[in-house]
Swiss-Prot record:
<feature type="coiled-coil region">
    <location>
        <begin position="698"/>
        <end position="757"/>
    </location>
</feature>
<keyword id="KW-0809">Transit peptide</keyword>
<dbReference type="GO" id="GO:0009507">
    <property type="term" value="C:chloroplast"/>
</dbReference>
<feature type="coiled-coil region">
    <location>
        <begin position="88"/>
        <end position="530"/>
    </location>
</feature>
<keyword id="KW-0150">Chloroplast</keyword>
<feature type="compositionally biased region" description="Polar residues">
    <location>
        <begin position="34"/>
        <end position="59"/>
    </location>
</feature>
<feature type="compositionally biased region" description="Polar residues">
    <location>
        <begin position="759"/>
        <end position="769"/>
    </location>
</feature>
<comment type="similarity">
    <text>Belongs to the WEB family.</text>
</comment>
<feature type="compositionally biased region" description="Basic and acidic residues">
    <location>
        <begin position="706"/>
        <end position="725"/>
    </location>
</feature>
<feature type="region of interest" description="Disordered">
    <location>
        <begin position="684"/>
        <end position="725"/>
    </location>
</feature>
<feature type="compositionally biased region" description="Low complexity">
    <location>
        <begin position="9"/>
        <end position="22"/>
    </location>
</feature>
<feature type="region of interest" description="Disordered">
    <location>
        <begin position="1"/>
        <end position="94"/>
    </location>
</feature>
<feature type="compositionally biased region" description="Basic and acidic residues">
    <location>
        <begin position="685"/>
        <end position="699"/>
    </location>
</feature>
<feature type="region of interest" description="Disordered">
    <location>
        <begin position="380"/>
        <end position="403"/>
    </location>
</feature>
<feature type="transit peptide" description="Chloroplast">
    <location>
        <begin position="1"/>
        <end position="78"/>
    </location>
</feature>
<dbReference type="GO" id="GO:0005783">
    <property type="term" value="C:endoplasmic reticulum"/>
</dbReference>
<keyword id="KW-0175">Coiled coil</keyword>
Amino acid sequence: MASKIKNGLSDTTLRKSSSTSLRVPRLTRIVTKPDSNSPSPTQQQSRLSFERPSSNSKPSTDKRSPKAPTPPEKTQIRAVRVSESQPQSVQIKEDLKKANELIASLENEKAKALDQLKEARKEAEEASEKLDEALEAQKKSLENFEIEKFEVVEAGIEAVQRKEEELKKELENVKNQHASESATLLLVTQELENVNQELANAKDAKSKALCRADDASKMAAIHAEKVEILSSELIRLKALLDSTREKEIISKNEIALKLGAEIVDLKRDLENARSLEAKVKELEMIIEQLNVDLEAAKMAESYAHGFADEWQNKAKELEKRLEEANKLEKCASVSLVSVTKQLEVSNSRLHDMESEITDLKEKIELLEMTVASQKVDLEKSEQKLGIAEEESSKSEKEAEKLKNELETVNEEKTQALKKEQDATSSVQRLLEEKKKILSELESSKEEEEKSKKAMESLASALHEVSSESRELKEKLLSRGDQNYETQIEDLKLVIKATNNKYENMLDEARHEIDVLVNAVEQTKKQFESAMVDWEMREAGLVNHVKEFDEEVSSMGKEMNRLGNLVKRTKEEADASWEKESQMRDCLKEVEDEVIYLQETLREAKAETLKLKGKMLDKETEFQSIVHENDELRVKQDDSLKKIKELSELLEEALAKKHIEENGELSESEKDYDLLPKVVEFSEENGYRSAEEKSSKVETLDGMNMKLEEDTEKKEKKERSPEDETVEVEFKMWESCQIEKKEVFHKESAKEEEEDLNVVDQSQKTSPVNGLTGEDELLKEKEKKKKKTLFGKVGNLLKKKGPVNQK
């Protein structure tokens, strides 16, 4: 190659001198850059030394004609370079196409995977929407069920409150009735107490009447002692009175005994009535409780019926809901089957996608390996492409320059009509040069494929040229020939031009390599982000599938729970029916007990009415007895008044006759002798009658006291402390009455003793006075008169006795 270049240089020295006029302006336009293969400082100095004469030689070159043709060796080198660079660029383009196709296939697979993911998402969203709809329907059914439950509970509470209010009102009515009944019972007890008080008053009146009768008998006995004549008739009257009194006392005692027995019976009846009343109260309480229980049972039965109806309705509704739920469950099962199928399909797709992803990962790894290898190839091809592109750009610039020159030539044609021949020749030459340039462009394309070899050959040629240039410089320095200087300058210019071209090609190749590297990095980043998104979507799909499975399991659990609830409701309905039957049986039993208690109440009320009737009869009898006692008291008062009148009349008569018959004391001594016996007899009879009366009174008092003690013992439990004080006062009053009786007996005994003393003194004074027979006659006359008077008084008393009895 070096010999060829030397021969070419020797052959082309003459030609270059003619063609420098065309090349110099081209080379001056190219920007020079420092190269690694640049010459040493000695070479730079030689260049400076050579540049000075080149500046001097420029006008000579400018004066040359620009119509000199280009050398054929350069065109051959360019054609070789283009031919070498073209297959490399084709391979690089094919590799780029393959890489782009792989990237497009990856993007298509990525788009397919994204579409599948979108479809799976859509399916999952549809399944989730279906599940949400099912859950919403279930929630709505549960909310409706809870609302209905709440409404039923509120209605039950309101009904219970109303029934409680009604029961309270009924209880108040029953309490009012009970209060009224208790008030009536209190009135009855008060009436009974009043009756007992009246009985006690009657007993007191009876005792007072007896006391008065005793007083009257004693007074009568005293008057009989004083009145001798009326003693026999008074004895008769006393006997009659005693007989009547005895009869009355016997009748009264019998009545009192009967009344006592009846009172005892009445008290027993009262006790029985009270016990019956207590039992009745207890029965009433039991009946009230039973009524309350009945009402509660009825209410419970009505509630149970209502609840049973409601539960039946609810059971029907629940059955409907169960049917709907079963339908929904079937739909859900169908949808679940479809969803499971879809999930299986999606799972299979996911597995396929995962396998594809693994394959893609492997492919990506392989692609990365290939990309790494291709990067190296790309770097190399980019270097080649850069060189070829630089050359093509330079050729394009040259073509542009040629166009500009053509324009200038055309202008010169218009300006220089005189030089038509030169212009035509120059045009022909330019056309030939055009053809050559076109051929050179075609050859440059071919040379692009062979740029590597040319670069290597150029590098070796550069080294050789540099060595030769050094040698030539040395020779030129020694010789100082101008031809060699021009050749060296031309070589320097060619070397600079080639260096600039290769530097531009390298820069462009580096730039393209950087662009490709950035594109590859961006594709890597996009692929990594796509992988991350893919993994995130895979995780989201897995989570969504898990959530879907959990929701399906929860739906199954809720369906099972609803089935259990329906079973429980059925069991509760059966239990409620059983409770209703039991409540009905209990209600029947309670109704039977209530009927029995009502019958017992009626019987007790009838007995109480009978007892009240008996009490009324006894009260009427008691009132009649009291009325008879009042009549007897009136009779006694009348008899006492008559006795007092008779005694007063007798005393007046005795007082009148005593004055007249002072002289007849002797005649009446016998009578006075008889008077003590009569008085004693009358006193004995009086005492006996009084003792009998007192014994009878004591027996009656004992009976009454026993009856009173029995009644008091029975009534002590029910009486208050005030009643006890009344009893104490009554006993004190009786003791005072007894003491008065004893004092009265003592006083009467003292008066009798004084009368006896007076009689004894009169007997003693009779002999002292010296009564004669005339006095005795007068006494006998007085006795006869007294007898006549006593007879009249007896007849009057006999006449008045039956009248009073009538």
